[in-house]
Design a protein with these regions (language model features):
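Catalytic core of membrane glycerolipid acyltransferases/transacylases, capturing the structured
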Residues: 112-173, 199-202
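Membrane-anchoring hydrophobic helices of lipid-metabolizing enzymes
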Residues: 1-120, 155-156, 163
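Active-site metal-coordination segments of metallo-dependent hydrolases
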Residues: 45, 150-151, 211-214
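Juxtamembrane/interfacial segments around transmembrane helices
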Residues: 83, 122-124, 272-274
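A conditional alpha-helix N-cap/helix-loop micro-motif detector
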Residues: 96-99, 150, 169-173, 210, ...
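Non-catalytic C-terminal accessory region of glycerolipid acyltransferases
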Residues: 2, 40, 58, 62-63, ...
Length: 304
């Protein structure tokens, strides 16, 4: 508690500062902080380089690697600054700074009366997808969020999202029921799908290696009839741009588990193409494949 309260205070202070000062003033500071984190986070830097190498299909020239790792940390710093700035923006300002292609896929699914599932990677400004949708007439938005530590910061972020009209569903044992209820109410549900935090997901081939992703999106789609729509939100110079892809087919073609695996693999295949458009905006700084854990063990033991 002693540590967590100052963290919440610091985040509130940062949010207040970025709302006051113009982007051109804040950007050099956020890039400086990104550089500090880069220099003092050996393991994160190592993992980001590995993940970038995957997205470039192991064709990333060594001379370009350092600059692209640096850019990844910079875009991640911008994600946090933009999220803090979002708190002070009106619906008009959000809408003015957001462009989207393929929105008809969300509209068509929503008009069918069963809330669609937006499958997103940790890419660019993913928070803006849900925030922008709250600006649209008639749309209710539910977001599934990962637990954060300390608890006070997590609670603060939940209240922050709820202040925009979002229905926040914490990831956990009761999340499935809550998401099903949201889908039945025709909410647009936002799910991050490129990391299996709980380690109980379905096996897929993702950027050349087998790993797991959450089985939730495919499972929920089969049980409710919801459309799964892959979406990515990219950072642009002074705005954000969303790409909405056609829905993944949720028609049954085999046993339940087989259909979950098939749909999950289709999700991953689309996410790969979305990530490869802007690899340096993929904010995956944790081990995500079995070989990552072995590599981390080697680096900790000094073998790398």
């Amino acid at each position: 508690m002693i540590v967590s309260k100052p963290l919440v205070f610091i985040y509130r202070a940062i949010a207040a500062i970025v709302r006051i000062f113009p982007v051109k003033f804040v950007t050099p500071i956020q890039n400086f902080v990104a550089r500090l984190v880069l220099n003092f986070s050996k393991e994160r830097k190592f993992l980001v380089r590995r993940h970038l190498n995957r997205t470039y299909e192991k064709n990333l020239p060594a001379k370009d690697s350092e600059e692209k790792v640096k850019k990844t940390f910079q875009t991640y710093a911008r994600y946090w600054v933009d999220s803090a700035r979002m708190q002070g923006l009106s619906d008009f300002q959000i809408d003015s700074g957001f462009t989207v292609e393929g929105f008809e896929h969300i509209e068509n699914a929503w008009e069918a009366g069963v809330g669609p599932i937006l499958a997103l990677p940790h890419l660019g400004g993913w928070e803006w997808a849900g925030r922008w949708l709250t600006c649209r007439p008639n749309y209710e938005v539910s977001v599934v969020v990962e637990p954060q530590k300390p608890r006070e910061l997590f609670d603060f972020m939940v209240k922050y999202r709820e202040s925009f009209g979002m229905n926040v569903i914490p990831l956990g044992p009761e999340a499935g029921k809550a998401v099903i209820n949201a889908i039945k109410k025709n909410h647009v549900v936002c799910l991050l799908c490129d990391r299996d935090i709980e380690g109980k997901g379905v096996k897929v081939h993702f950027f050349g290696e087998e790993t797991t992703i959450p089985a939730g999106p495919a499972t929920l789609a089969i049980r409710t009839g919801a459309k799964i729509i892959p979406v990515a939100v990219y950072q642009k110079k002074n705005s954000h741009h969303a790409v909405v892809c056609p829905p993944i087919s949720s028609e049954r073609s085999g046993k339940f588990r087989e259909d979950v695996e098939r749909m999950s693999q289709e999700i991953v295949t689309v996410l790969e193409s979305l990530i490869q458009k802007e690899p340096e905006q993929w904010h995956l700084m944790q081990p995500n494949w079995p070989s990552d854990f072995k590599a981390l063990k080697d680096i900790r033991s000094g073998r790398i």
